[in-house]
């Protein structure tokens, strides 16, 4: 059985707060979820036990997959896919209601799917290069990497 894990962003990219006098960039928290009906939801952690208000639109579920660097892949992550040395392009991980599976799309909320996660193959074929909240510039309509 795969791990049920969610993540959410407590602050927007570029938004800073001070913790113990030190400015801190936007961050992510990981854990369980209490979904909200408005702009905010709550992610709770187990060790230590705590809760965090996060932006609802940044919440993503762990897909059960890890990339070639051993990083957990979440909804909203941007992956670069290379199979047997052939560049397949870049896509954002999103849930596909029609097929009831996670898929890679060329850009958020598009109908242009690169590949279903079930067909993605081995972890060495894909690498997380960012996420659609902090790194939207990495996505393009054609699925190639934007510099």
What are these regions (language model features)?
Residues 1-147:
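Secondary-structure transition motif
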């Amino acid at each position: 059985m795969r791990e049920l894990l969610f993540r959410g962003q407590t602050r927007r990219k570029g938004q800073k707060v001070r913790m113990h006098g030190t400015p801190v960039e936007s961050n992510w928290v990981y854990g369980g979820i209490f979904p909200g009906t408005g702009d905010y939801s709550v992610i709770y952690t187990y060790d230590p036990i705590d809760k965090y208000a996060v932006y609802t639109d940044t919440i993503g579920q762990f897909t059960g997959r890890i990339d070639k660097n051993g990083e957990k892949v979440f909804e909203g992550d941007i992956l670069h896919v290379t199979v047997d040395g052939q560049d397949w392009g870049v896509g954002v991980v999103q849930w596909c209601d029609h097929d009831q599976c996670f898929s890679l799309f060329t850009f958020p909320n598009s109908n242009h799917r690169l590949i279903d996660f079930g067909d993605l193959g081995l972890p060495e074929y894909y690498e997380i290069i960012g996420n659609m909240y902090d790194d939207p510039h990495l996505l393009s309509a054609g699925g190639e990497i934007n510099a």
